[in-house]
Amino acid sequence: MSSYVPNTLSVYHNLLILEASFRKTYLQLQVRRQKYMAFYVSLLVWNFYFGYRVFYRISKYSLIDLTYKLCLLCGIVTLLLFYFSGLYRTTIVYPSRYVQQVNKAMRFFNIRLVITPVPWFQVRKPLDCGVHLILSSKRFDILVIEGWEAFRSSYFASIHRKNNSIQSNESSESPSSKQN
């Protein structure tokens, strides 16, 4: 038997691809969760408002009172459909448990997915926002872990430099030079 030791750069590259895949899925799930959470909150506000108008502030006009009751009924039916169709679970509950489920699946490989918090007021998000992979010291040597962190940070630094050079080239070109 020959003991095959894989090239560490190819392993780092594959880990980077895996991390990018996890990051993309995590960010997509967070956007979907925010969208449906806004829908869910607006639906709750809708039901509370029309419930208040139907039960506590009854209108003296029967047509307006009937409209309030129909709006409340539509809101309750929509809320029940949202729960019983499974949309609540797949759009709000599952995205918040994504990292836990990935960590359970990756436990065998001694790799963890960790959320990197980014301030909400930061306009330009870094390239590695969302999540990143951490190698466990149980299975991996300290040199491999440090090599992975160095490879990862140098990769994102090179991507950042490339994006900055592209932006500076685009901003340095003037509209008059493009027309000539």
From Swiss-Prot:
Keyword Transport: no
Its membrane topology: Multi-pass membrane protein
Molecular function (Gene Ontology), one example: protein phosphatase regulator activity
InterPro entries with a match to the protein in the record: Spo7 (IPR005605)
UniProt-annotated glycosylation sites, renumbered to this chain: N163, N169
Subunit structure: Component of the nem1-spo7 complex.
Function: Probable regulatory component of the nem1-spo7 complex which acts as a phosphatase and may be required for proper nuclear membrane morphology.
Name of the protein described by the UniProt record: Sporulation-specific protein spo7
Organism: Schizosaccharomyces pombe (strain 972 / ATCC 24843) (Fission yeast)
